[in-house]
Each structure stands twice: as structure tokens, then as C-alpha cells.
Amino acid sequence: MQFSSYEDLRSRLVSHAITCEEVVRFYLERIENHRGDNIYITVFHDQALERARTLDRKLREGGNPGKLFGMPMAIKDNIAMKNCRLTCASKILENYESVYDATAVLRLEEADAIFLGKTNMDEFAMGSSNENSAFGNVPNPFDKTRVPGGSSGGSAAAVANGLALVALGSDTGGSVRQPAGFCDIVGLKPTYGRISRYGLVAFASSFDQIGVLGLNCDDVALVLGVMAGKDEGDATSSRHPVADYASEMATLSVDGLKIGVPKEYFPETLNPEVSRMVKGKLEELRAQGAELVPVTLPDSAYAIAAYYILVTAEASSNLARFDGARYGYRSEMSEDLAAMYVNSRTEGFGREVKRRIMLGTYVLSAGYYDTYYKKAQQVRRVFQDRYREALDKVDVIAGPTSPFPPFGIGDKTENPLEMYLADVFTVPASIVGMPAISVPLGFDSMNLPVGMHLICNFFEEGKLLGIARHMQRSL
């Protein structure tokens, strides 16, 4: 019982060829068979089956199926679901249950989606390999000695392994797009504010955005359309009208499309096979009528530095709420209140989270605020201006998703700076808040996935998805 797309699944459901319960049982069996891969932190076995029976009954009784009727979905474990565990893959929240639903979850539920469980991730979404999880790392679906990417590695692996049709992730600096590239699937980070962040556990509030991972652009567009739109629960969510993404994708033509190709995205250090495959796809698009336009983004070298100053500063503030006093893990080895705070955080947070909290506290301190944090904010504004200028001249900016294919488990854990460079091509879109997507290009000579990264102007998700769909269909 395999499905190439949601359209394939839906046609079989509404024609009564199969039932939602049969679909859910199929996916739950696959999840059980992959239990050793740590892809799911929590599986909603009974809840998913009950939900499936409810939807089957609705269809039998003549009810109108929702836009996502029967879609089996996975949810990253930093997105709130009422009365379900919300761990953020951290010891400090290991047994915490959310008391409310994220807006994105509510909208998916209203559209008749089915949730199979919560997926593994880097702790508090801090990481690029899924190795920072308190619940163990997740292997790459195509080589179990390698990483699936992060921080939404569990969501990407779930889709790639056929353990969910579509999954939600969160993207702060590439956490949806980079694992999508490493797992040979589509991963979309929408414009900042396109999807409500209400119910998304905050890492860096001015960067965080819920994203979508799927096998194809049509499924991703459908889920995006359901979740997108203003939410009074999130003041940063946008009132910009939600487009008809399917229509925009259908009318997109590659002929005459201007594709910006920054030389900064193809440094000498870029993996040769990644470079060859991305350039090959660009030449293929040129042959189909697109125009390749050289663009210059001279400040690209500062992207990683500015990003890690800004997000760690925000993280040090956001994670102050996890203190052992109100909820979550509390150390039993404390003599007084001050010691309880220190011990709970020391024992509850993993090494990478503590590293980022300390760095963020440092750059916000009185003696270094102007030198680091203020300068990074200025660099962010320069980036926004540069990308606006570039996208005034071209339709899309293209390059690799990652500078290298999936790397080995443990290869970069002892060198945080080398790990951070995995996001060098995805971070700029997060700094400026523009929509970006990773689309599969196929496999290199070692049978490892390679992804291509596309950036469009604010709220041009329809165009972005249309270009990505054309590329994926021409593979």
C-alpha cells in the first residue's frame, strides 16, 4: 500500500477503495518496523486509529471530506498538541504534556488530517544532524552510517522512509531544508509570518517558522495552503492574502524565467559532485528557456557569524523559562532555590543547547552588546537590502542546499564550527525572512542525496513551488 502523492491516496479513499483505518494501520506497522531508527519520539497508535474510524464514518454518512482528508502526517516534537508529550527532544521536557494545540495543528485537524506521532529532532531545534537529541540520533534513510540532517531530521526521515506522507518541521536557519536535501525529499520554509508560530516552542523568535516536508511539491503546497494565514494568537503572523498555490504552480512557465546564480554559492570548497549536479540542473533549465543571471551577494561570508550571534542571543532569552520551577525536569540534588535552578538546567539541557545559551548570554552582556549583537543586527539589515535588490532583477536565486552530501554520524560533533557550516547556504533566507525550498536533484556517485536550494521574494511561495515542481518532474 504505497502512495506516490496525496492525490493518489485521496482518490482511493473517496472512492471507498480503501479506508482511513487501513491506511493508518499500514503506516503504524511501518513505524513499528523502523522503531530502532528513533524516528518517532511518540507514536499516537490508539489516537490515530480512533481518528481514522471517525473520518471513515464521516465519509460513509455523506459528509464532505476536508482538504487533507485522511492524510497521515508526522509532527516535529517542538509543535504543541494538546494532552500529548512535547519534549523538544530534551531531558528537561521529557515528560511534559502540552495543555493546548498549536494553531497549525488545529488548522490541519479541521482539514481532516490524521496525526501519526511526534518526530525526533535536535534538542530545542539546535543542530544540523539530529545528533543532539536526548532520545538518540536518527540514521539517514539511504545510509544508516550517516545523518539525516537537522534539526527536523526525524520529520525528514519519516517522509523518506514512508512512515508519514507529509511532516511538519520548524526552520530557524535551514532545519527543514537541509534535512530535506539529505533525505531526497522536498522541504519548504515559507515567508516569515506566513504560518502562525503559536504553539511552536521558541528557539529564535524572529527566525523561527513552521515548514513542510513531503515527497512532492503538490502535497507541500496543499498543506501550506491549509496552515497559512493570519492568527490572532501570533502577532508576527501576516495578513498578506493566502494565494491559490495550486493555480500559481500550474501556470508557471520556465521559459523566460530569470534565475539568479550567485558566485558566492559556488566556492572552491564546495563538494565537487554537489557543484556538478547543481550546475547541471541550471544548464538544463537554461536549455528549457530560462535565463541564468549572475548575481553578486558580497556579504555572504558574514551570514553564519551574524546568524549564530542573533539566534543564540534570542535562545538565551527564550530558554530562560525552563528553570525547573514551573514545569519540566527538576533536579533533586539541590540544597536551595538557586542551586535548583542551576542544577535543573545543567542536568536537563544537552551540551549544544548549553553552548548556545552561554554564547547568547555573552553577546548580550553589557561589554559586548554593541560589538557583537548590534553589529549582527546591522548585518541582517544589509542582507535584507542585498536580497531585495537581487530579487528585483531575477525571479529566483538558486544554489546548493548544503555544501556537502550527508556526512557520517559523529564526523562533526566534536567541531561545532564545522557543523554550523552545514547551513551556510540556507541561513541567508532565514536572515532576510524570504521563502526558500530544497528540491531533490538525485544521487551522487556514492548514492547519497543532493538537494538544490531556491529562494524567492516575500510571499512568492506559489512561484517557488512551481519552479521546484518543474525541476522535480524533469528528473
Swiss-Prot record:
Pfam families: Amidase. NCBIfam families: gatA. PANTHER family: GLUTAMYL-TRNA(GLN) AMIDOTRANSFERASE SUBUNIT A (PTHR11895:SF151), TRANSAMIDASE (PTHR11895). GO terms for biological process: translation. The gene is gatA. Belongs to the amidase family. GatA subfamily. Its EC number is 6.3.5.7. This is Glutamyl-tRNA(Gln) amidotransferase subunit A. Keywords: ATP-binding, Ligase, Nucleotide-binding, Protein biosynthesis. Allows the formation of correctly charged Gln-tRNA(Gln) through the transamidation of misacylated Glu-tRNA(Gln) in organisms which lack glutaminyl-tRNA synthetase. The reaction takes place in the presence of glutamine and ATP through an activated gamma-phospho-Glu-tRNA(Gln). Heterotrimer of A, B and C subunits. It comes from the Bacteria. It catalyses: L-glutamyl-tRNA(Gln) + L-glutamine + ATP + H2O = L-glutaminyl-tRNA(Gln) + L-glutamate + ADP + phosphate + H(+). InterPro entries: Amidase, Amidase_CS, Amidase_dom, AS_sf, GatA. GO terms for cellular component: glutamyl-tRNA(Gln) amidotransferase complex. One of its GO terms (molecular function) is ATP binding. The active site is at 76 (charge relay system), 151 (charge relay system), 175 (acyl-ester intermediate).
